[in-house]
Structure formats: C-alpha cells, structure tokens
Amino acid sequence: LVPINMAVNTAQTILQILVLVLTRNYVVYLSVQIVCSIILMALQNIYITQKYSEVDFSSKDRLPSEKTVEIKRNVSGLIIAKIGDYLVNSTDNLIITKLVSLAATGIYSNYLLIRNMINGFIATLFSGITASMGNVVAVENDEKKLEIFDTVFFCAFLIYSIEATCFMSLYNLFIGDIWIGRNYIFSAGTVAVIVLNNYLTGLRIPLITMKGAAGKYLEDTWIPFGFAIVNLVASILLAKPFGVAGVFLGTIIGSLFTADWYRPFVIYRTVFHAPVKKYFRKYMVYLLLGVGYIALTYWLNAQIYLSNAYLLFLVRGIVSVGVPALLSCALFYRTTEFGAIKTLTIRLVRGTTARLCSKKEDRNG
C-alpha cells in the first residue's frame, strides 16, 4: 500500500499547489483533498481485494461475542484518542489568533503548509511500518520486538533530525526570498521553537506506531486530553511574554509532561515487558543530538552568502542534509540499529536494480 499512498499523496500535493497558485480558492483546495482521499480509499480497497482474493469479504459469518466486545472497546479507545489529538492540534492556531494576532496566524500557516506536505510523505513511510510491526507483535518474542522498535526509533531520529536541520536553515529563505516575501516570516528564535516542536513530535511517532500495531488503545486514553489541558494553560501563560514562540513552548511543555513520559511506560510494560530507562536514555541522546545538528547546521549555513536565492537554497539544502547524515553515520555506524538500516537499504537497492534490469531485458527480448 505504501506506493499507492505515496503516489496519491504526491498527486494531491501537486494539485493543491496548482489550485492555490491558479485559483487562490481555499474551498477548491479542500475539495482536492476530499477527492484525493476518496480515490485513495478506492484504490486501497481494490488492492486489498485483489491481494487477498482467498478472503470472502462478503461473508455473513459472525465473530465470537468476546471478540466483538474487544473490537468495540478498542475502536472506542481509538475514537477518544483521535478526539484528544484533534483538541491538541487545533488549539495552537486559536491561541495565536486570540492572544497574538490574526496576522501571526496567517504567517504561521505558511510554515504549517510546508511542514504538513513534508510530514505527509514521511507519514506514508511509517504507515507501511505499522503493518509490519503488527506482524512482529503477533509472532515475535519480546526481545525481537524491542530490537525492531529500536531500529524504527533510530530511523525516526535520522529522518526527523535531517528534516529539522532543513526546516531551520531553509524555512525563512524559501518563504522570504523565493516564495512570498520577507514580510511573511518569523524571527529565527520563533522558527527554532516551531522546528523543535515538530522534531519532538517526530520522535514520538515510533511509540504511536507501536501502540497502534499492538492494539493498545485503552491504556492511555487520558493522554491526549491531559496533553490538551497542559498545552492550553502553558500556551496561554507564555503567549503574552513570548508571542508565537510562547504558544509552541506551551505545546512542548504539554508533551513533556504527558505523552513523552507516560506512553513509553505503557508500551514497555505491556508490549516489551522491559525496563523503560533504556528508552529514555536513547530519547535524551536523540534529542540532544538533534538540537546540536540544528544549531551546527544553522551556523554553517549562516556563513554561506550567495546573491542568487535559488542557488543559495540549493547549497544550504545540501549542507542541511549532509551534515546530520554524515554525523549520524560517524556516531552510530557500529550500532545494531545502523547495521539493520544499512542491510535493509542495500536489500532495497539490489531489489530495485534487479527489477529494473529485468524490465529492460524483457523490452530488449
């Protein structure tokens, strides 16, 4: 399903950009999203029906009552969690509008649009991992589950640390000098807080993925609501003295005081049956390294001056990707997680190369 998701998401992003540029109509922009979502669900249904043709999807057989009750409880927990997540994600814009200004909300929407597009592609990757993790949870022992989780956690660190360095160094350059003008950008300090908040969100994704794969929907249903309350209070208190940066500092505080410490306990206690201190050690290492990568790359890019904004964007982009990637390779190349990702990458490259060569031979034949 990953290629289908990625193809539709790519087409949706391109169409939405064209709609905004050509029509400047937000209703049409949202309509494109709705249509693409319907098309994606239809394609997923066709793929699953063909892939698992041995399954009778029209069967009228009923599940045992205990299974039905379990599914209903899990679905209820999932719905509650989604409502809580919506409350968390929807409060920031409201607080910025009310306590800072409507103009600041408009400026932030530029950053949010770019972030959502990039994160959409990354989410497609992790959506494919969820299904694999579900199989791991079902058939593997606790040690193997933890080993695979550590690899996914490291993968999230690699991806989101590179994304964070790119955002910090390229956000204002792209929005201010290439896209719509320097009147529509935030200060570097505010951008840093926005980037840090997104980075912390990325580091939480492996836990959320494992939670979904293991079906642990009821153990932490209070988390999104607790997160939303702490986020709301902290953001309101910090918005006055620090503006937009204060709102996202409140979000960071909300996550640190709720999801970032409680959810690991749930997963490690109920899925891995292992002590959680190992997770927190890795989390602190990844957090500090991510912040270090952001600071170092931003400083290096600040030393680069070119008159052409497009060329400057290209050069800074190469630096923003290269520095964290090379440093991570140097620091982690002896670890089990790095070895697993290296092996998987080599396997994917070889498989892709073999398929391309096979298609070329078929055409020549």
What does each model-identified segment do?
Residues 1-3, 27, 195-227, 237:
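Membrane-interface junctions at transmembrane-helix termini in multi-pass inner-membrane proteins
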Residues 8, 32-44, 48, 64-135, ...:
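Transmembrane helical elements of multi-pass membrane transporters/channels
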Residues 10, 27-49, 112, 148, ...:
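Short alpha-helical transmembrane segments in multi-pass integral membrane proteins
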Residues 10-42, 50, 218, 225-260, ...:
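Membrane-interface helix-loop junctions in multi-pass transport and translocation proteins
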Residues 18-22, 122, 146-202, 232-240, ...:
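Alpha-helical transmembrane segments of multi-pass membrane transport and lipid-handling proteins
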Residues 26-30, 44-89, 132, 140-147, ...:
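Interhelical loop/hinge segments that connect adjacent transmembrane helices in multipass membrane
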Residues 54-57, 111, 115-153, 208-213:
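Helix-loop junctions and terminal segments of transmembrane helices
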Residues 272-275, 298-365:
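Membrane-proximal transmembrane or re-entrant/amphipathic helices at the cytosolic face
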